[in-house]
Amino acid sequence: LDKVDLVGGVSGGSIVAAYFATHGSARLPRFEREYLRQDFQENLLSYALRPGNLVALSSPWFGRSHLLAERLDSLYGAATFGDLASRKGHPDLLITATDMSLGTGFEFSKAQFDLICSNLQSVPVSFAVAASSSVPLLLSPVTLRNFAGQCEPPEVVGDAWEDYRTRLYREQARSYLDSN
């Protein structure tokens, strides 16, 4: 595991992938005690029912998935993607969530964030994991702000690529260039 350069996860798999990326292989055996053996669902419910969180949940800008991200933040030591990039000996992390508007995957990657003119480095790892793990109806969707049009679009959306998969990717990428 010490030779792994990239770890990725989607849905529940993103929880352990992010743990490995933030803490490395030496601490991986502790994951069972720190997460798997905890009644995370009950802890999340108790956390949601705290008076301050009940008030926050009434806000249109704060949802149940934000509470999940807050609870996961302690598991990852409040790490951001920028923190991960600066660590030596830890693998890169790729978390994939679902773009509900397109029905496709949304990668928490520099390339994807470049498309929406946003900065992945400042995003908490827990936020990406919550976005990936959010089960519709049980947890609220996580919304990212699209700043398209406020930066130069990346080269990937040019017309130079011809193969089928690349055309599909290019069309998906172009959809992010419209911030409306």
PLM region spans:
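Active-site gating loop/helix substructures
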Residues: K88-N180
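Hydrophobic/aromatic-lined pockets within catalytic cores
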Residues: G24-S25, Y76-T80, F113, S134
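Residues that form generic nucleotide/phosphate-binding pockets
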Residues: E34, R71, L75, A128, ...
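Residue-level detector of alpha-helical segments with a strong bias toward transmembrane helices
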Residues: Y19-H23, E70, L144-N146
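Surface-exposed patches in mature extracellular/periplasmic domains of secreted proteins
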Residues: K3-L6, T80-H90, S140-V142
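Patatin-like phospholipase
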Residues: L1-F62, H66, K110-Q112, C117, ...
